[in-house]
Structures are given as C-alpha cells and as structure tokens.
Curated annotation (Swiss-Prot):
Female salivary gland (at protein level). This is Yellow-related salivary protein SP03B. Keywords: Glycoprotein, Secreted, Signal. Residues 1-18 form the signal peptide. It comes from Phlebotomus perniciosus (Phlebotomine sand fly). Coiled coil: none annotated. InterPro entries: 6-blade_b-propeller_TolB-like (IPR011042), Royal_jelly/protein_yellow (IPR017996). SUPFAM superfamilies: 3-carboxy-cis,cis-mucoante lactonizing enzyme.
C-alpha cells in the first residue's frame, strides 16, 4: 500500500511540475470583455470546448447555453493581448446569432467550424432563442472578422433526438494541397449512438449506427467524496495520417467505455458502405474519456479522461493495451477533462471545466476551477511509454 501511495504521489507531482506545462489559464469565474457583469450570471459560464489558432494566436472557446444569462456562446481570447492568468473572453466577431455551441474545430484550410445545436438546454427563453434545426457553419480565419463561408442545416431525421446530443466532431479535408472543396465532417451523437457524416461537396448528410458506438458500462464521476453514475455512447473522434488516396484512420471512443476503435474514412465517405471497424484494444480500467486527439508529429493519441483527473497517451505504432499507455499529466485540480486538441505547431492543449455533468451540482468560486493547459507534444511524451525513439543505424 505504501508503494502504491508513493506512486500516486509521484504521478501527481510530475503532472504539475515534470511534464513542461508551458501555459495555464485558470479562472475562478469567467467574465466577458466589454459586457456589464450584471447582464450575465458567472455561475453559468462553463466552457466545454476550444481550439487554438496558432497563426493568429487566438483561442476560440465555446460556452454552451445550458442556463440563462450567457451573452455569447462562442468567444475569442487573444493570447497576445491577454497574457494574464485569468483573462476575460471577447465576443466572436464572425456572428452574433449563434444559439448554442459546444465545440469549435479548425481545419487545415484555416476554416473555423462549429455545430450550432439550434436550441438552448433550459426552458424559459423560447422567444429569445427559438428552437431550430442544428446547423454546421464554417468561418474564414484568414480574413478580418471571420466571414461566414459555409452553412448547412442538418435535417432533424439525421441530427437525432430533441435534446442536445452532439459530442465531439472532426473535419476531414481530403487533399488540402488541391483545395478545400472536398471536405467531410464527422459528428458524434452520444444519445442516439450514431455518427453523422456530412459531405460538403455534395451538401448531403447521413448517419451511421453500430454496436461499437454504444456505452459499454456505467461510468463513475467522483465529486466531494461522492460518486455519481452516468452512461453515454459515442463521444470523441479524431483523425490519423492520410494515405496517398486521402483516406485516414478515424479513431473513436464511447464516453462509457475504455475501448478504442478505428475505421477508415474511405468507409465513412461512402454513403451506405459496410461499416466494419477494428477494435484496437482496451486502455485499462477507469480510463473513460469524452475527448481524444491525434498528433501527427509524434503519432500519439492523447485522451482527456473524465474522472481520473489526468491526460493519458498511446502511441499508434504500438499495440493498444494498458502496458503501452501512460499518463502525461495529472493533477487533483484538473476536474473533468472536457476537450483536448493539438494545434498546427504541435502544441497540445487540454481543458478541464471543474464542472462534472452532475445534476444540481453546486459550485464554489473561491478558487480557480476552469483550467486550460498547454504543452509541446514531444516534451509531453518524453520518457514515457508513448515515446518511440528512432532506431540507431
């Protein structure tokens, strides 16, 4: 037992100190730049997703409208103007009519994609935010004020249930060197356990169902000494390296599962194709996650785990099992990892909301609970089981 406790202590110490975390934003509560604090409720400002534009040094952060008094559901943080630890968020200049956004994604053409679910997650504001079909929108980050350049309304029969069931999503530009027109978007639905595929060129969408999308068991969230059960299906998806034909492995996870699956995007891009994924293996007990990301530089997938308060890794060049996974960050302060991404400069970013999805959860705001961390991917895996060193000649 003493050895076990010592190992836990070492992991937590290294997670905070030893893995070269180069920047940390930490908020007790989030404010909006230029907005009277009386117009919003700080208790409700809980971000769930983000993405970093390494060229403009800006972070786009989604603050879903789960509760009233949220001025903007998509925000912007200019890291050059706000080097402070707890900066305010600014209104996203591309649109002021968004209803409810959970995650932004940047593709290789520097388009910012969002999936606006079209409804708020509470009752009482129907006139202000009337229910609409979910919509995919792309903005051009290369131009001032990010003009909208693409919009697609997802049919209700494809989007799924009447709640807000979207998890993560991935954008697949088939061949960026030849242009951006041939693009597919893959959106997870964790309630219906389906994967939505959108073909930008044909402006068509369809959904895929499969047993691997379903939750495997009840998952546990720990908070204030109590344990809460939850059960969610397909949630996270990330894309690997392209082959010469522009196809890539799509890696996906259910939120209540520790297995990782792979399917070729060649199958996803063909409407009606036989869906036959590969079960890559099991990451081990208590490693459930709702977000994952592939880093092309290191060939590593990183997982923001839901309850363990850690970020783990697996090198895709090795078989997947608990002996080939490792922890690159752990901290008691990293409460509920909700999103993780790698930017164009191979910087790994990960977000904890401090707000696990527990009904009627009451938070105190006496210390920072929302955290956004950054670390270079190569440094993150150094001296871990996820590092694969080149063979000596």
């Amino acid at each position: 037992m003493k050895i076990f406790l010592c190992l836990i202590a070492v992991v937590f110490l290294q997670g905070v100190v030893g893995f070269h975390v180069e920047r940390e934003y930490a908020w007790k509560n989030i404010s909006y730049e230029g907005v009277d604090p009386a117009l919003f409720n700080i208790d409700n400002i809980i971000p769930t997703g983000f993405v970093h534009d390494a060229i403009n040094k800006k972070i786009f952060i989604a603050v879903p409208r789960r509760s009233p008094q949220i001025p903007f559901t998509l925000t912007e943080l200019d890291t050059t103007k706000h080097p402070e630890r707890s900066p305010p968020l600014s209104k996203f200049p591309g649109s002021d009519k968004l209803i409810n956004v959970y995650q932004p994604v940047i593709d290789e053409c520097r388009r910012l994609w969002i999936a606006d679910v079209g409804r708020v997650d509470y009752k009482g504001d129907e006139q202000k935010y009337p229910n609409q079909n979910a919509v995919l929108i792309a903005y051009d980050l290369t131009k001032e004020n990010y003009p909208e350049i693409h919009r697609y309304e997802i049919p209700s029969k494809i989007a799924g249930s009447n709640t807000i069931p979207f998890g993560g999503f991935a954008v697949d530009v088939t061949n960026p060197k030849e242009g951006c027109g041939k693009t597919f978007v893959y959106i997870t639905n964790f309630e219906d356990n389906t994967l939505i595929v959108y073909d930008q060129e044909k402006k068509d969408s369809w959904k895929i169902s499969h047993g691997s999308f379903k939750p495997e068991h009840d998952s546990t969230l720990s908070h204030d000494g109590k344990q809460y059960k939850y059960r969610v299906g397909l949630f996270g998806i990330t894309l690997g390296d392209r082959d010469p034909e522009g196809n890539r492995p799509a890696y996906y996870i259910a939120g209540s599962s520790t297995k990782l699956f792979e399917i070729s995007t060649k199958i996803l891009k063909e409407k009606g194709a036989k869906f036959d994924p590969v079960n890559l293996g099991n990451r081990g007990p208590h490693t459930e996650a709702v977000a994952l990301v592939y880093d092309p530089k290191t060939k590593v997938i990183f997982f923001a785990e839901s309850d363990s308060r850690q970020v783990s890794c697996w090198n895709t060049q090795k078989p997947l099992n608990h002996k080939n996974t490792d922890v690159i960050f752990a901290s008691a302060k990293f409460i509920y990892g909700s999103d993780i991404s790698v930017d164009s400069e191979s910087q790994l970013w990960f977000l904890s909301t401090g707000h696990p999805p527990i009904p009627n959860l009451k938070l105190t705001f006496d210390k920072p609970h929302i955290r956004l961390m950054r670390v270079d991917t190569a440094k993150a895996i150094r001296r871990t089981r996820c590092e694969v060193k080149p063979r000596k000649p």
